[in-house]
Amino acid sequence: MTPTGDWYKGGDEVGAPSACGGGSALMTLPEKNLGYKPETETNRRLRWMVGGVTILTFMALLYLVELIDQLTRHSLDNNGIRLLKTDVLWGISFAPVLHANWQHLVANTIPLLVLGFLIALAGLSRFIWVTAMVWIFGGSATWLIGNMGSSFGPTDHIGVSGLIFGWLAFLLVFGLFVRRGWDIIGCMVLFAYGGVLLGVMPVLGRCGGVSWQGHLCGAISGVVAAYLLSAPERKTRALKEAGTDSPRLKT
């Protein structure tokens, strides 16, 4: 998938007189320096609007779920990810939208808005793929190692912080893979919000612990997502570095 705003090149076919007299021969010329065609201002605004609406809608969903949870005396909190329980699909599906309390959700709000918006700017399709991969793969891995290193006994993993760590890892690694401004953006986000992520860890509702397992699994899933979703850009870069991109034979 190519994000909105990628550029394209063009070239011309040239007919030149043949050295043998008569007719013409096709020539191989480097592409004209037509420059890159940036996205229009309208497309840029639309992309920002779609990104903003997407992440704000998701955030509104989280607050709605927490409101329902509060009104039902935390009846939803038991639906998180629990180690090797047979209701694994249920836990993986709902754990990221559940939070122990309002403080837990508020602590995750700013990193979620910033990181989610940055990924959404790359396109709605890419945002959906990244989120789905971190959500499913990170949740599945947490289901496998959920109690590792825990001194509280069986744990119930809830909260969107695993997804946040996945998004952060994706931004950093994706930028390194494609060698574009994403790595700079990712590093800026890391320095700006890394302290928030480390200092305000999500709290599990009943055991008072930190789901470092969910954070770790989410981050690993983000790295995997970055590798898989950067394949088109990496392939294009490899072709350019191999010298197969220009000059081209114009026919």
Swiss-Prot record:
Keyword Transmembrane helix: yes
Record-level Gene Ontology MF annotations: serine-type endopeptidase activity
Gene source species: Mycobacterium leprae (strain TN)
Secretion signal span: none
Lineage: Bacteria, Bacillati, Actinomycetota, Actinomycetes, Mycobacteriales
Membrane topology designation: Multi-pass membrane protein
Pfam families cross-referenced by the UniProt entry: Rhomboid (PF01694)
Alphabetical UniProt keywords: Cell membrane, Membrane, Transmembrane, Transmembrane helix
Protein name: Uncharacterized protein ML1171
